[in-house]
Amino acid sequence: MLDIQQIQQIIPHRYPFLLVDRIVEVEEGKRAVGIKNVSANEQFFVGHFPEYPVMPGVLIVEALAQVGAVAMLMKEENRGRLAFFTGIDNCRFKKQVKPGDQLRLEVEMIRFKGAIGKGKGIATVDGELVCETEMMFALGEK
């Protein structure tokens, strides 16, 4: 399990754009599971939407990408590098995410060749699917 400080040692994201609170499972270079506790105080709720706060779907996908980056960058040969988000395929949103929800973010690497990878991401709240997607990554130097 990784806490927020340990996550920040692996990926460069910081508040307000760090969208993972902790990693609860990880297999280096293969898969990871993260948790995001969605607070009513999230900055994006100020404008999305003031009378009906809903977490933007693109930020759910970004949270999945951050979990995938942790999995990839924990692999010994990738430590100290950056993971760049390069594409999204087959993305579907099934349910809204609101203040008070806890997002479970699961990412499994499907393919990894050289510096390019592809992962499948699933986000759930209380066991219900809210988002599924395939994401592409490229590893680069800082």
Curated annotation (Swiss-Prot):
<keyword id="KW-0444">Lipid biosynthesis</keyword>
<dbReference type="GO" id="GO:0009245">
    <property type="term" value="P:lipid A biosynthetic process"/>
</dbReference>
<feature type="active site">
    <location>
        <position position="48"/>
    </location>
</feature>
<dbReference type="InterPro" id="IPR029069">
    <property type="entry name" value="HotDog_dom_sf"/>
</dbReference>
<keyword id="KW-0441">Lipid A biosynthesis</keyword>
<dbReference type="GO" id="GO:0019171">
    <property type="term" value="F:(3R)-hydroxyacyl-[acyl-carrier-protein] dehydratase activity"/>
</dbReference>
<dbReference type="InterPro" id="IPR010084">
    <property type="entry name" value="FabZ"/>
</dbReference>
<comment type="function">
    <text>Involved in unsaturated fatty acids biosynthesis. Catalyzes the dehydration of short chain beta-hydroxyacyl-ACPs and long chain saturated and unsaturated beta-hydroxyacyl-ACPs.</text>
</comment>
<dbReference type="GO" id="GO:0005737">
    <property type="term" value="C:cytoplasm"/>
</dbReference>
<dbReference type="GO" id="GO:0016020">
    <property type="term" value="C:membrane"/>
</dbReference>
<protein>
    <recommendedName>
        <fullName>3-hydroxyacyl-[acyl-carrier-protein] dehydratase FabZ</fullName>
        <ecNumber>4.2.1.59</ecNumber>
    </recommendedName>
</protein>
<dbReference type="GO" id="GO:0006633">
    <property type="term" value="P:fatty acid biosynthetic process"/>
</dbReference>
<dbReference type="InterPro" id="IPR013114">
    <property type="entry name" value="FabA_FabZ"/>
</dbReference>
<dbReference type="Pfam" id="PF07977">
    <property type="entry name" value="FabA"/>
</dbReference>
<keyword id="KW-0456">Lyase</keyword>
<keyword id="KW-0443">Lipid metabolism</keyword>
<comment type="similarity">
    <text>Belongs to the thioester dehydratase family. FabZ subfamily.</text>
</comment>
<keyword id="KW-0963">Cytoplasm</keyword>
